[in-house]
From Swiss-Prot:
Protein species of origin: Neisseria meningitidis serogroup A / serotype 4A (strain DSM 15465 / Z2491)
UniProt subcellular location: Cytoplasm
Function: Nucleotidase that shows phosphatase activity on nucleoside 5'-monophosphates.
Protein name per the record: 5'-nucleotidase SurE
Catalytic activity field: a ribonucleoside 5'-phosphate + H2O = a ribonucleoside + phosphate
Alphabetical keyword list: Cytoplasm, Hydrolase, Metal-binding, Nucleotide-binding
Length: 248
């Protein structure tokens, strides 16, 4: 079995090293990741310039583009490697609730799913760097189960690992996406020349962390698995929309 691995934190991140190291115990691995941090780029493609693929000393490949670019290149340019599965991560920080719409980590998995492959995005609910041992232990548990009976059809799973000590992980729960309040979207400032500039502000506070949500269960110490879908059609609003537009 072949697994293509990517992320949005870049090929030098700790998370992708952990993911590649553990996955290599179960399958053949090829890493194709952005050359730098591309967090928050979602499913964007690089269309205004050509891309380059280079190989680092550790064997990882890197691209001067987005996570989505990396999936396309990883599946297109290697005659000796065609992926059966795509793993993305492990992201330094959670990707839960509305965050999944912006996440390059989730986007890499999404693109693979659109290409017909089973895909999984992994994130650690911590940005301090203190819980990589937890992430690695959780990954061993998750992948041992995954490869015992691998999915045969395309799936898209978003997995978040809690920020607790390894011995305090309480298990695995299937969870729905929670929600956030809108954050302070734009922060005005001045550059050293006195010119007006703007920063995109921090994310908002969690507004839905009820039991059964990814926020709630992960904060309670569980590894959360959320099955995602791509179809954005609001089927329950179809009839009402037809009435508004006076269609038959």
């Amino acid at each position: 079995m072949n697994v293509l691995i990517s992320n949005d934190d870049g090929y030098l991140s700790e998370g992708i090293a952990v993911l590649a190291r553990v996955t290599a115990e179960f399958a053949n691995v090829r890493v194709v990741a952005p050359e730098r941090d591309r967090s928050g780029v979602s499913n964007s493609l690089t269309l205004e310039r050509p891309l380059q693929l280079k190989q680092a000393q550790n064997g990882f490949y890197y691209v001067n583009g987005t996570p989505t670019d990396c999936i396309h290149i990883g599946q297109s340019v290697f005659s000796d490697f065609q992926a059966d599965f795509v793993f993305s991560g492990i992201n330094r920080g959670a990707n839960m609730g509305d965050d999944t719409l912006y996440s390059g980590t989730v986007a890499a998995a999404t693109e693979a799913y659109l290409m017909g492959m089973p895909a999984v995005a992994f994130s650690l609910n911590d940005a301090s760097g203190r819980y990589w041992a937890t992430a690695e232990q959780a990954l061993w548990t998750l992948l041992a189960h995954f490869f015992k009976n691998p999915p045969q059809s395309p799936i898209l799973w978003n997995i978040n690992i809690p920020a607790v000590a390894p011995e305090d992980v309480r298990g695995i729960k299937i969870a729905r996406l929670g929600r956030r309040h809108h954050g302070q979207n734009v922060i005005p400032a001045r550059n050293p020349r006195g010119e007006q500039i703007y920063w995109i502000g921090p994310v908002g506070e969690v507004s839905d962390r009820e039991e059964g949500t990814d926020f709630g269960e992960c904060e309670a110490g569980f590894i959360t698995v959320t099955p995602l879908q791509i179809d954005l059609t609001a089927y329950r609003d179809m009839a009402e929309t037809a009435v508004f537009w006076h269609t038959d």
